[in-house]
Amino acid sequence: MAVKTYQAGVTQYRQSYWQPDYVPLDTDILACFKITPQPGVDREEAAAAVAAESSCGTWTTVWTDLLTDLDYYKGRAYRLEDVPGDDTCYYAFIAYPIDLFEEGSVVNVFTSLVGNVFGFKAVRALRLEDLRFPIAYVKTCGGPPHGIQVERDRLNKYGRPMLGCTIKPKLGLSAKNYGRACYEALRGGLDFTKDDENINSQPFMRWRDRFDFVMEAVQKAEQETGERKGHYLNVTAPTPEEMYKRAEHAKEIGAPIIMHDYLAGGLCANAGLANWCRDNGILLHIHRAMHAVIDRNPHHGIHFRVLTKILRLSGGDHLHTGTVVGKLEGDRASTLGWIDLLRESFVPEDRSRGIFFDQDWGSMPGCFAVASGGIHVWHMPALVTIFGDDSVLQFGGGTLGHPWGNAAGAHANRVALEACVQARAEGRQLEKEGKDILTAAAAHSPELKIAMETWKEIKFEFEAVDQLAIANK
């Protein structure tokens, strides 16, 4: 066994952290970074620097390296790839030994992989494109409190996407008027109504008043329709203690589901709330407020597919994913990729959808994908095609903006959805025949007919800022 000796000084990162012959272990956490290096910094050195700074390295040699097995604990940059169509940056693949990270702590994973290294001067920009979590790590995480099948069984809703609605205006309503808006939408045919992400406990509507009036609305709508209903009560709060206080009250008044802003509220708070929901039989809806600050820049930040994986590990039964056809960012191929990462047990590498690694989730339950943001009845055929059954299609303005009111807007959406589900069962192509399908349904539904007339010219056709960088789309 060679004797280790200490030599003070500064060495190139590539001497220790660039290892092109390394074969990743099944237990390694793998990362794909998009690196834009500073001028004069070669690719291998920049990749090795990222591997070092995101694992156990620092800028100089230290004598305490002799007290550990650095070769075991270090991150290893093992492969570089060009980014198709962009010669200013490249992909670097880095492997991290599983023992670098606390079991079941996505907080700890992020502290290393997207911590100080993102301010490192050797790189001009840095983006975490994807992560592969080994099954050995997945098994240490709590995951969704309940998952898709448990939620369907509890609500007795099968064979179709579920319908939701974010109450508008998002701010300013009194608690009683807010509850009334919920009731009208639920009795009209929706499965859920929802707090907007920035509704917490403001002077115009304190959280306890909102919870009480909303649950009165939910229970009344259930009695009238004979269907299970719910409202996503946002328990996001200034402190964890206050968050749990709100969650406990939601449980006391019979709420089947609560809501959390997992990025703004924090991953630590989210994991704790997911555990509470699992223990108390409450479903957990997750909003992604703040994600675009992190993921929209194609050269710097964290891709949303990573945030999707982190949420599934941290815990949530629903996650907002964008719509493709609505007002929010997200191209179709990428969105289909992260929808699968939310729901499937195993997702293979697929560069055409931006997935860089195989991801095995084992027996971890999946999450409902939530489509929300600028959608209306004309989008229904595309939404059913893109998102499939295990999704929640949320029409805020597309419900409450109906000329005849909330109940009519909800009814229009329900008729449109059921028409699309029936047409799909008949083997029809929804996106090609969508207009005919909706027009036929509208002949028997004046609510749908008016909705189609109201929003027939409304489209959100903007090119995505963050596009897939693949050789053959």
From Swiss-Prot:
One of its GO terms (biological process) is reductive pentose-phosphate cycle. Keywords: Calvin cycle, Carbon dioxide fixation, Lyase, Magnesium, Metal-binding, Monooxygenase, Oxidoreductase, Plasmid. SUPFAM superfamilies: RuBisCo, C-terminal domain, RuBisCO, large subunit, small (N-terminal) domain. The active site is at K168 (proton acceptor), H287 (proton acceptor). It catalyses: 2 (2R)-3-phosphoglycerate + 2 H(+) = D-ribulose 1,5-bisphosphate + CO2 + H2O; D-ribulose 1,5-bisphosphate + O2 = 2-phosphoglycolate + (2R)-3-phosphoglycerate + 2 H(+). RuBisCO catalyzes two reactions: the carboxylation of D-ribulose 1,5-bisphosphate, the primary event in carbon dioxide fixation, as well as the oxidative fragmentation of the pentose substrate. Both reactions occur simultaneously and in competition at the same active site. The lineage of its organism: Bacteria, Pseudomonadati, Pseudomonadota, Alphaproteobacteria, Hyphomicrobiales. Heterohexadecamer of 8 large chains and 8 small chains. The basic functional RuBisCO is composed of a large chain homodimer in a 'head-to-tail' conformation. In form I RuBisCO this homodimer is arranged in a barrel-like tetramer with the small subunits forming a tetrameric 'cap' on each end of the 'barrel'. It holds the Pfam family RuBisCO_large_N. Its EC number is 4.1.1.39. Binds 1 Mg(2+) ion per subunit. This is Ribulose bisphosphate carboxylase large chain 3. Belongs to the RuBisCO large chain family. Type I subfamily. The keyword Lyase applies. It comes from Nitrobacter hamburgensis (strain DSM 10229 / NCIMB 13809 / X14).
